[in-house]
């Protein structure tokens, strides 16, 4: 069947890239973009990075919108349905429901992303925020500007970026992490500890292996009670304990839901005309032969485009294969990771994690390099990503690292002569 109506549910990066890819592929039919937020699609990473980092009085950080109204209307020719989430899906009649509104489709890309996990019994307190949306970031930035005593719950990437912004302002900040070592799922135990040491080096208190018993206050948060009995005074609490895929609206739709929407390697859900992309897509990555659900900018952009192209031409659908990539900025340093952290060996091939502000670690599985983690290694990280994509051997990766080390040493020696 020829596709005349493309509907994209999700007004963030994956949804936008789906729309753009459809038009770039020559699709001339109607496109409807449904977004739960009232804002035009905007870039999320800056919300916990440079958007929070603006500290100069009178300087307003630009809101990171991807495109203006005129681009959506005139260039992409998209009907925008913003400010209300999708509430249901009828795959037999090919209808997406947004409240009482029924929107028909021939092809559908679901890119509803993820939602923040919250602490129980915290909804009644002002001053408690997650960080997922533009409105979240605006509220947190206002509190930091006012000098709020800040407690960040969860030492993951988002929470740590908030702590970095607080520290930049000279705000008193403490990070609380329930696990003994932060970032284990993202980078492994050894390197998680190495990254977490950036907090201590920059004067941020990090408490690990301790959970939160309760948040206390009279209408507004005043204290964080930890499960070891200690109490932290707080005017602002930022909760960064992870996310879960936004799939509740799809219950009973016929789609398979298991840690997201279960897809095949082409991002097809198994239901005619329906594809998924971004945080919500659980798909088998042919690069590593494992099922993944990725929560990063790169995957959202790539999957959104792939899902749209495949939805418009399912007979020629192509698998989505990738080497995952994410980055995070803390205290003026950039952390970058490519690949997967599941490995038999992690080897530091450049620098010293305890003393240097630049280092590189590689991850081995069998005889192959499967991951690389760098601190301030912007010039090398994508070279390792290409090596992983090419399924380079561990020996080749070590040889490459040694050549880089020797070259750097030679340059340093020459400059000192």
Predicted regions mapped to residue ranges:
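N-terminal Rossmann-like dinucleotide/flavin-binding domain of flavoprotein oxidoreductases
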Residues: 21-105, 187-205
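FAD-site-proximal beta/loop scaffold in flavoenzymes
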Residues: 126-147, 219-225, 230-306
């Amino acid at each position: 069947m020829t596709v005349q109506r493309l509907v994209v549910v999700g007004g963030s990066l994956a949804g936008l890239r789906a729309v753009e890819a459809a038009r770039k592929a020559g699709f001339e039919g109607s496109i409807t973009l449904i977004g739960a937020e009232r804002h035009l699609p905007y870039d999320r990473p800056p919300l916990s990075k440079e958007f929070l980092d603006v500290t100069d009085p009178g300087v307003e950080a630009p809101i990171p919108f991807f495109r203006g109204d005129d681009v959506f209307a005139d260039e992409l020719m998209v009907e925008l349905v913003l400010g209300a989430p999708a509430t249901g899906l009828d795959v037999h009649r090919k209808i997406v429901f947004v409240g009482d509104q029924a929107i028909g489709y021939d092809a559908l890309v679901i890119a509803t992303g993820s939602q923040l996990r919250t602490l129980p019994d915290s909804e009644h307190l002002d001053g408690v925020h997650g960080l997922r949306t533009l409105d979240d970031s605006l509220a947190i930035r206002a509190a930091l500007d006012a000098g709020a005593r800040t407690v960040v719950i969860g030492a993951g990437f988002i929470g740590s970026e908030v702590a970095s912004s607080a520290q930049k302002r000279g705000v008193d900040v403490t990070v609380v992490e329930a696990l003994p070592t932060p970032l284990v799922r993202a980078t492994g135990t050894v390197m998680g500890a190495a990254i977490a040491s950036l907090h201590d080096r920059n004067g941020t208190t990090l408490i690990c292996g301790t959970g939160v018993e309760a948040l206390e206050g009279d209408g507004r948060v005043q204290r964080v009670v930890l499960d070891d009995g200690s109490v932290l005074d707080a005017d602002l609490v930022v909760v960064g304990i992870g996310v879960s895929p936004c799939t509740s609206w799809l219950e009973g739709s016929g789609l398979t839901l298991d840690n997201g929407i279960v897809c095949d390697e082409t991002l097809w859900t198994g239901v005619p005309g329906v594809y998924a992309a971004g945080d919500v897509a659980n798909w088998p990555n042919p690069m590593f032969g494992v099922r993944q659900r990725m929560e990063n900018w790169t995957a959202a952009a790539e999957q959104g485009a792939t899902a749209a192209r495949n939805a418009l031409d399912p007979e020629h659908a192509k698998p989505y294969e990738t080497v995952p990539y994410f980055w995070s900025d803390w205290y003026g340093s950039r952390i970058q990771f490519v690949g997967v952290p599941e490995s038999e060996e992690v080897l530091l091939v450049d620098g010293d994690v305890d003393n240097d502000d630049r280092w590189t670690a590689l991850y081995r599985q069998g005889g192959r390099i499967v991951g690389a983690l760098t601190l301030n290694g912007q010039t090398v990280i994508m070279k390792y990503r290409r090596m992983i994509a090419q399924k380079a051997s561990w020996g080749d990766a070590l040889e490459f690292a040694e050549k880089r080390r020797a070259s750097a040493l030679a340059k340093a020696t020459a400059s000192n002569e």
